[in-house]
From Swiss-Prot:
It catalyses: 5-amino-1-(5-phospho-beta-D-ribosyl)imidazole + S-adenosyl-L-methionine = 4-amino-2-methyl-5-(phosphooxymethyl)pyrimidine + CO + 5'-deoxyadenosine + formate + L-methionine + 3 H(+). Zn(2+) binds at residues 433, 497. Coiled coil: none annotated. Its EC number is 4.1.99.17. This is Phosphomethylpyrimidine synthase. Substrate binds at residues 235, 264, 293, 329, 349-351, 390-393, 429, 456. It comes from Alteromonas mediterranea (strain DSM 17117 / CIP 110805 / LMG 28347 / Deep ecotype). Pathway: Cofactor biosynthesis; thiamine diphosphate biosynthesis. Catalyzes the synthesis of the hydroxymethylpyrimidine phosphate (HMP-P) moiety of thiamine from aminoimidazole ribotide (AIR) in a radical S-adenosyl-L-methionine (SAM)-dependent reaction. [4Fe-4S] cluster binds at residues 577, 580, 585. PANTHER family: PHOSPHOMETHYLPYRIMIDINE SYNTHASE, CHLOROPLASTIC, THIAMINE BIOSYNTHESIS PROTEIN THIC. Pfam families: ThiC-associated, ThiC_Rad_SAM.
Length: 642
């Protein structure tokens, strides 16, 4: 059996056996909102008690509270959920959308290409059977979250997000867990508690976006903005060479379980339309695309044959399926292409190179730029957010921060203002390959020229010499730019520059970027960001091994590494690990020092009283001797008695 066939069969088996699954010693918890249908999922990591005294037979224990953490896994993280990918997820937001009375149900799909696929008998065997018809804004209505926010309306999505961002941390009262370093936020506004009104204000100002197409009611609302938790995106999708629908659905589920806040389907192979439908109907997180990829497939890969009408049809096709944000490379202008001529690596963005080739072959301005107003009109009818693509991003550290990159960035700032005129939500995409000392300038330039719209970067990679380890090279840059104010980080997997990532590569990329995003939150001083770190440190010092595993971003790997050398059950309660052994464990020695200090502290009052008594006796003896050492003195004696 070929390796490709094996991978597909394994993915099919994964889907067939798919069930809600909790992390080790974790439970799903739902925080309620102002209405019954606002139930915000989060994960509680339960801990064991701390041993604070007593004897082996009669120990004195102190309970440790469960640690709440942000959960992107949707129903896939709840063991009580019945999951059937052939039916899709429940439409969480359906009632919220209907209550606003500003949408209408279409008779069927509007896109010419979507109609063709529906009537194609060759797609019947692998087509997702959709039960709902697409929605669209009523005439004269705008259905974007930005529009509602500017009208002063707090939507259920905004309330959901406020609860989600707070993560139930207010319930933790232990000062040892809530202590936190101040951090350096570089001008970000980080309130102690996120309120629905704060969410509304940030969206209204364009500083944050809520990607949530009206045709993707299955998603759990989330927010992207520098005044909120740093988010991460996972790229999945097939290619002309490899992957199948089953494998992409498996990657979707896998990605959400390991912490992806959004997913981008970058499929460039066969059956793109059908693959996307399966992903959307089963995605609890927002899903983005690069529509130019599919448009290029429709013209058999010949960029010169692309037209506005074909691209427009692709936008409508994807919007009616439920795509939550489009990456549009509208900033790649004809006059900027020559700026890349002297670069070491030229234009490395697929979308950027497609549009550059189109501009040169027709010697015309980009149709994405020329029709940008039309694009915004389409997005406003479905609430598709725009992710303005960095088609001229640097593909090597040698090309970082050059004229081509920053010329495009300034144009993206101009396009942002146009999109806002239509109440269309916008975020800005960034590099790329940038050495560490040049990263901060990227954030500063973006804030300056793009009016504080959220920044979304691919890394950046801080060096070019580590193929196979570019999740490391980019994780460094991601942590830095996240600290400076980047709102969302696009993961890079170990396969970057080498091949299409598999399931394990996706996990490695996500864990790396969860680390980067969390490190950025810590550095910014985001309220509550340090709670999990403090819990881990306490568990580590107390040799609560099981809690250390469970508090880790990847409990399975943490446990496996520990058990390689200490697999016995006794190893889970030992006051040492295999690194130092029982005699040289710094934590154990520190505990012994602390115990000795505590004993000395307890003895101190009694010792002090004894010393005071001894001093008093000496003082009295000195006074007696000074008075002449006589037992008795006459009544008229002038001797000063003690």
């Amino acid at each position: 059996m070929s390796n490709r066939r094996e991978q597909r069969q394994q993915a099919q088996q994964f889907i067939n056996e798919l069930a809600g699954e909790a992390y080790p010693n974790s439970t799903r918890h739902y925080e309620s909102g102002s209405r019954d249908d606002i139930r915000v999922a989060m994960r509680l990591i339960h801990q064991h008690d701390s041993l604070v005294g007593g004897t082996e037979d009669n120990p004195i224990l102190e309970p440790n509270p469960p640690i709440p953490v942000y959960d992107t896994s949707g129903p896939y993280g709840d063991p009580k959920e019945n999951i059937d990918v052939h039916k899709g997820l429940s439409p969480l937001r359906k009632t919220w959308i209907e209550e606003r009375s500003d949408t209408r149900e279409l008779d069927g799909v509007s896109s010419s290409f979507a109609k063709e696929r529906e009537n194609d008998i060759f797609t019947e065997d692998f087509r997702f059977i959709r039960s709902r018809k697409p929605l669209k804004a009523k005439a004269g209505k705008n259905v974007t979250q930005l529009h509602y926010a500017r009208q002063g309306v707090i939507t259920p999505e905004m309330e959901y997000i406020a609860i989600r961002e707070n993560m139930g941390r207010q319930a933790i009262k232990d000062a040892e867990l809530t202590q936190q370093h101040k951090g350096e936020h570089f001008g970000a506004n980080l309130p102690e508690t996120i309120t629905p009104e704060f969410v509304r204000q940030e969206v209204a100002a364009g500083r944050a976006i809520i990607p949530c197409n009206i045709n993707h009611p299955e998603l759990e609302p989330m927010i992207i903005g520098r005044n909120f938790l740093v988010k991460i995106n996972a790229n999945i999708g097939n290619s002309a060479v490899t992957s199948s629908i089953e494998e992409e659905v498996e990657k979707l589920v896998w990605s959400t379980r390991w912490g992806a806040d959004t997913i981008m389907d970058l499929s460039t192979g066969r059956n793109i339309h059908e693959t996307r439908e399966w992903l959307l109907r089963n995605s609890p997180v927002p899903l983005g695309t690069v529509p130019i990829y599919q448009a290029l497939e429709k013209v058999n890969g010949v960029a010169e044959d692309l037209t506005w009408e074909m691209f427009k049809d692709t936008l409508i096709e994807q919007a009616e399926q439920g795509v939550d944000y489009f990456t549009i490379h509208a900033g790649v202008l004809l006059e900027y292409v020559h700026l890349t001529a002297k670069r070491v690596t030229g234009i490395v963005s697929r979308g950027g190179s497609i549009m550059a080739k189109w501009c040169l072959s027709h010697h015309q301005q980009s149709f994405l730029y020329e029709h940008f107003n039309d694009i915004c009109e389409i997005c406003a009818k479905y609430d598709v957010a725009l992710s303005l693509g960095d088609g001229l991003r640097p593909g090597s550290v040698a090309d970082a921060n050059d004229d081509a990159q920053f010329s495009e960035l300034r144009t993206l700032g101009e396009l942002t203002k146009i999109a806002w005129e239509y109440d269309v939500q916008v975020m800005i995409e960034g590099p790329g390959h940038v050495p560490m000392h040049m990263i901060k300038e990227n954030m500063e330039e973006q804030l300056k020229h793009c009016h504080e719209a959220p920044f979304y970067t691919l890394g950046p990679l801080t060096t070019d010499i580590a193929p196979g380890y570019d999740h490391f090279t980019s994780g460094i840059g991601a942590a830095m730019i996240g600290w400076y104010g980047c709102a969302m980080l696009c993961y890079v997997t170990p396969k970057e520059h080498l091949g299409l990532p598999n399931k394990e590569d996706v996990k490695q990329g996500l864990i790396t970027y969860k680390i980067a995003a969390h490190a950025a939150d810590l550095a910014k001083g985001h309220p509550g960001a340090q709670i999990r770190d403090n819990a881990m440190s306490k568990a580590r010092f107390e040799f609560r091994w099981e809690d250390q595993f469970n508090l880790a971003l990847d409990p399975h790997t943490a446990r496996a590494y520990h058990d390689e050398t200490l697999p016995q059950a006794s190893g889970k309660v030992a006051h040492f690990c295999s690194m130092c052994g029982p005699k040289f464990c710094s934590m154990k020695i520190s505990q012994e020092v602390r115990d000795v200090a505590k004993q000395a502290e307890n003895l101190a009052p009694a010792q002090a009283a004894e010393k005071e008594k001894e001093k008093g006796m000496k003082d009295m003896a000195n006074a007696f001797n000074k008075s002449g050492a006589e037992l008795y003195h006459t009544a008229d004696s002038k001797v000063e008695l003690p």
